[in-house]
Amino acid sequence: MDKKVTEVVEALAQPIVEELNLELVDVEYVKEGKDWFLRVFIDSETGVDIEECGAVSERLSEALDKEDPIPHLYFLDVSSPGAERPLKKEKDFEQAVGSQVAIKTYEPIDGEKMFEGKLLSYDGTTITLLLTIKTRKKEIQIPMDKVANARLAVTF
C-alpha cells in the first residue's frame, strides 16, 4: 500500500466526512490484478446508507480530480467498513472493549501470530484478550507495537 497516497486521501476525505457528520474509518490503496482500487470506509453511530456513501464519493472524487495525487487510473469505492470493521485508532479499540476481535501480530507471541478473542481492556499501549482454547480460557496481553492489524470478529 502506498502510504503517501493514503495520507493525501485521508487529508482530503477528513473534512468531507466531518461536514456530513460521518467518521473516516480507513483508507486503502491496493492493486488487485492489473487494477488499482482506492477504498474509503466511512461510518457513523447509526451506520451509513448508500446516499451518504454516494455523497462522500462525489465530493471526494471532485477533490481528487483537483489535487490529482494518483498518477494512474484507479477505481474509487466508498462504503461502510462492514461487520468486521478494522480497529485503527485508539477510539476504535476503546469502543471495542467487550467485543470479539481478531488480532494479527508482526511477530509470534507465545508461538502464535493470529489471535481471536474477547477484548477485555485497552490502555493505549497494551491489548488484553480473553482467548478460548477448547474448553479453557486464557488471558493474553499484546503490546500495541506488535499489532499488525486488528478488526472486529463476527461470531455465530
From Swiss-Prot:
CDD domains: YlxS_C. GO terms for biological process: ribosomal small subunit assembly; translation. The keyword Cytoplasm applies. It is found in: Cytoplasm. Its main location: cytoplasm. The keyword Cell cycle does not apply. Required for maturation of 30S ribosomal subunits. This is Ribosome maturation factor RimP. It comes from Bacillus cytotoxicus (strain DSM 22905 / CIP 110041 / 391-98 / NVH 391-98).
